[in-house]
Amino acid sequence: MHTSIFAPLFAFCLTCSAADAAETKSTGDTFPHVIETFEVGENVNVRALTVETGKNTLWVGTSVGVHEIDIATRKVINTFTRDSGLANEYVFAVGVDKNGYKWFGTNAGGASRYRDGKWKTYFPMHGLADYWVYSFANQRNGDMWIGTWAGVNRVDLRSMKFTTYVKELINEWVYGIAVDKQDRVWFGTEGGVSMFDGKTWRSWSHKEGLGATNQGKLAASPNTGLGTRSRHDLSMLSGDGKLTYNPSYVFALQITPDQSVWAATWGGGVSRFDGTRWQNYTTREGLAGDIVYSIAQESNGVLWFGTNNGISRYDGKSWHNYDKKAGLLEDNVYALAVAPNGDIWAGSRRGVTRIGR
């Protein structure tokens, strides 16, 4: 049974639970299940999900603009497009800084900043490393980091000074950023992972164990579609139509309470770094798909992974997977976020799925 309620540019579709259809290697307690879906359009992609905890709202970055959703009521609060002040409607990243400004990373439009109805967009002329912006992260000292296709920016939010780092990184194409308890900053790039502790840099790639070996016999690809400025479709296919593989290509990072670093790789599954070595998890261990786009973490440490074949929930011991049969809008899940009430929000083509108990 499906019930649809339409709002401007954002349709709400209530979906029946289908948890029993999920593939699982777990037993025991009842798992979270798909509760409802929000559709944004047949050919629209949801690429970014960010929870603003102070307001209990969810920011949804899509290929046609940004929506602000009230988490409690699931109602649309705001919809922003180019006419509203957004630099470009194709949004790959959403961040919230210490001053409550919302930052939107766009495809070829720079970074737009918003608060209280006022907009400002930053371009390379202002110090931004590139027009293509893929990630934001905040340090405890208040600085914001911005990942682009031409390095990273460290932004002093008091002076709005932009400092750019390129050569220090293992690769200049930066997709994911995470900050650990020591305020060290980790960067996921198309060539591996780099870490900056404030003074020195370190880097790791597949040579050091990042990403599993090519178990699926996928086509080798140093460039999967995101690493070329002529295509922005998150293509998983090589020229001959085969799934591609690049274990050093890291699209997202997550730091867990034990300070392990989890890296989402392109074809090499998900990798966990304990400070000494990398341990890889693939479909052989229970991961839904070996191309991993996104990672989110619950307050209890449970991890969620968005892949090319659905979502995986991992509690440190066992896996539980979700796909279209379980109620997801699509199997390719590009973005994940955890709401204050523990619900999981998943972004894909066509819209967003909410998972909860």
Where are these regions (language model features)?
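Intrinsically disordered, low-complexity segments
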Residues: H2, T15, Y245-N246
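Carboxylate-rich, polar loop motifs that coordinate divalent cations or form catalytic acidic clusters
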Residues: A19-R357
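Bacterial N-terminal signal peptides that target proteins for export
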Residues: M1-A7
